[in-house]
């Protein structure tokens, strides 16, 4: 290797392969000579290449990484300098960055994207509570701890600032493809630009390219300056929760964009069920209630509680690192899933009986809705949902149930008292009960595969890696 291409020298470390490079820095994989050859990453910043802005970015990055400690934020272990370089010594992430991860797989399944989003949202919530905005969120700045069951690590805080939703800086920061429109169009922006960037990352992970992906800078500029609503592709099919979040994140007007509080509480982000030390405690509390209801013969209530408990048990299973405790927990989870499936059969038979009994009421309601085309149309969708349900097409049936219920609930609020309102209320109750049952049924199937060791994230990665 020519001397000019050799990595810099740093006492106590052996610098090896180059991991990446930017305008003023190069990152190397390195080994600490002591401490059992600990593996780290070292960002080597050439002093010669630093202008005033670069110095400010570097100082910002060091200041923030020194003070923030979070499982999903890259850890700064130390920083040193000599006459030629400033060295940032960080934890090493063997999985590379999210950009490469997406590129090698083209698109990611929604469930994998949700796991990644939870981790990113967790880091952003931590930063938001400290009034820190990243301002350069993009897949290249999100690292993966490893390829097998990776954890995301938010990195590269060179553009970060201490700011809130009221602040309005003037300087243009970040990467255009992931940059919120207000950063370009008005130059006045606040912390909400990070939410737009999350939307772009989410879009790219699900659809394989960013919404403003362009062949030239002029085309990119045109898309950024446009007032057109961001259209979501119809394929791959997304859950209603995922689609709703994307649409709320990718609002060009920051005042119409989802707020941080709403984002952290959103059903698709679901921070409540993110793997953590608390999830096992919550799961245990719920399963105790489920067993009590089960013993009392309250099957429907017991099924609901078992399902709620499993929503915490599965992330608790992923969080547990001790092999023996994990296996014991998995055994218990399998028992609870088996009991939930038994209860499903009991509840389903009575549930379906109610559904079929509701047919005559539904037909009568249709007759009474001849003068209300919108109500009649929603009832037709409900009938289609029941037909799909009878065919065993749970996913399609659930979509149709939710579609019809959205309309019927609006109709109910506007309906005058009388026989039609009574029938409509009864129909909604029946459809809602069946929709909730199907949701729980689909979740139980997912939990079963996860609890049996087919851990969603690592399984997907293994399948993807086998194609390379």
UniProtKB/Swiss-Prot annotation:
Q: Write down any Gene Ontology CC term.
A: phagophore assembly site membrane
Q: Does the keyword Calcium apply?
A: no
Active site: which residues?
136 (proton acceptor)
Q: What keyword terms does UniProt attach to this protein?
A: ATP-binding, Autophagy, Cytoplasm, Kinase, Nucleotide-binding, Repeat, Serine/threonine-protein kinase, Transferase
Binding of ATP, residues: 19-27, 43
**EC code(s) of this entry:** 2.7.11.1
Top EC category:
transferase
Enzymatic reactions: L-seryl-[protein] + ATP = O-phospho-L-seryl-[protein] + ADP + H(+); L-threonyl-[protein] + ATP = O-phospho-L-threonyl-[protein] + ADP + H(+)
Name a Pfam family for this protein. MIT
* Compartments it resides in: Cytoplasm
Q: Which residues are in the Protein kinase domain?
A: 13-269
- CDD domains reported for this sequence: STKc_ULK3 (cd14121)
Q: Listed GO molecular functions?
A: ATP binding; protein serine kinase activity; protein serine/threonine kinase activity
Using the record's annotation, list all stretches that form the MIT domain: 279-347, 374-442
Its GO biological process annotations read: autophagosome assembly; mitophagy; negative regulation of smoothened signaling pathway; piecemeal microautophagy of the nucleus; positive regulation of smoothened signaling pathway; protein autophosphorylation; regulation of autophagy; response to starvation
| Superkingdom of this protein's organism | Eukaryota
- Extract the InterPro entries matched here: Atg1-like (IPR045269), Kinase-like_dom_sf (IPR011009), MIT_dom (IPR007330), MIT_dom_sf (IPR036181), Prot_kinase_dom (IPR000719), Protein_kinase_ATP_BS (IPR017441), Ser/Thr_kinase_AS (IPR008271)
Q: What family, per the record?
A: Belongs to the protein kinase superfamily. Ser/Thr protein kinase family. APG1/unc-51/ULK1 subfamily.
PANTHER family this protein is in? SERINE/THREONINE-PROTEIN KINASE UNC-51-RELATED, SERINE_THREONINE-PROTEIN KINASE ULK3
State the function annotated in the UniProt record. Answer: Serine/threonine protein kinase that acts as a regulator of Sonic hedgehog (SHH) signaling and autophagy.
Q: Would you tell me the protein name for this molecule?
A: Serine/threonine-protein kinase ULK3
- Gene label: ulk3
């Amino acid at each position: 290797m020519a001397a000019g291409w050799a990595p810099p020298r740093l006492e106590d470390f052996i610098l090896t392969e180059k991991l990446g490079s930017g305008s003023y820095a190069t990152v190397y994989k390195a080994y600490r000579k002591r401490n059992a050859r600990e593996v780290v990453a070292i960002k080597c910043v050439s002093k010669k290449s630093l202008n005033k802005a670069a110095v400010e970015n570097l100082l910002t990055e060091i200041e923030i990484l020194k003070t923030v400690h979070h499982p999903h934020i890259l850890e700064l272990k130390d920083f040193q300098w000599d006459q030629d370089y400033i060295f940032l010594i960080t934890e090493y992430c063997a999985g590379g960055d999210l950009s490469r991860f997406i590129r090698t797989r083209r698109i990611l399944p929604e469930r994998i994207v949700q796991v990644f989003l939870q981790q990113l949202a967790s880091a952003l919530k931590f930063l938001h509570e400290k009034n820190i905005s990243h301002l350069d969120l993009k897949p290249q700045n999100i690292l993966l701890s490893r390829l097998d069951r990776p954890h995301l690590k938010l990195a590269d805080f060179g553009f970060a600032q201490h700011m809130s939703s009221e602040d309005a800086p003037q300087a243009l920061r970040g990467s255009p493809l992931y940059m919120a429109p207000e950063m370009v169009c008005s130059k006045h922006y606040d912390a909400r630009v990070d939410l737009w960037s999350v939307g772009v990352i989410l879009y790219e992970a699900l659809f394989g390219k960013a919404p403003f992906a362009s062949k030239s800078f002029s085309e990119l500029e045109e898309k950024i300056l446009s007032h057109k609503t961001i259209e979501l592709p119809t394929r791959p099919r997304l859950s209603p929760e995922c689609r709703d979040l994307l649409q709320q994140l990718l609002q060009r007007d920051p005042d119409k964009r989802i707020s941080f509080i709403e984002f952290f509480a959103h059903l698709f982000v679901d921070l409540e069920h993110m793997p953590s030390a608390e999830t096992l405690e919550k799961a245990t509390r719920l399963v105790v209630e489920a067993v009590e209801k089960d013993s009392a013969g309250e099957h429907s209530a017991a099924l609901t509680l078992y399902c709620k408990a499993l929503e915490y048990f599965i992330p608790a299973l992923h969080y547990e690192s001790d092999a023996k405790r994990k296996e014991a927990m998995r055994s218990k989870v399998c028992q609870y899933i088996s009991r939930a499936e038994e209860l499903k059969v009991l509840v389903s038979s009575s549930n379906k009986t109610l559904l079929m009994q509701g047919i005559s009421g539904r037909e009568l309601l249709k007759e009474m809705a001849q003068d209300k085309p919108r109500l009649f149309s929603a009832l037709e969708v409900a009938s289609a949902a029941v037909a799909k349900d009878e065919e065993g097409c749970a996913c399609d049936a659930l979509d149709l149930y939710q579609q019809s219920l959205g309309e019927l609930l609006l109709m109910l609020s506007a309906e005058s008292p009388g026989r039609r309102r009574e029938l409509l209320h009864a129909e909604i109750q029946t459809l809602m009960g069946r929709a909730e049952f199907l949701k729980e049924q689909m979740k139980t199937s997912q939990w079963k595969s996860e609890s049996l060791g087919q851990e969603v994230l690592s399984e997907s990665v293994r399948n993807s890696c086998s194609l390379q």
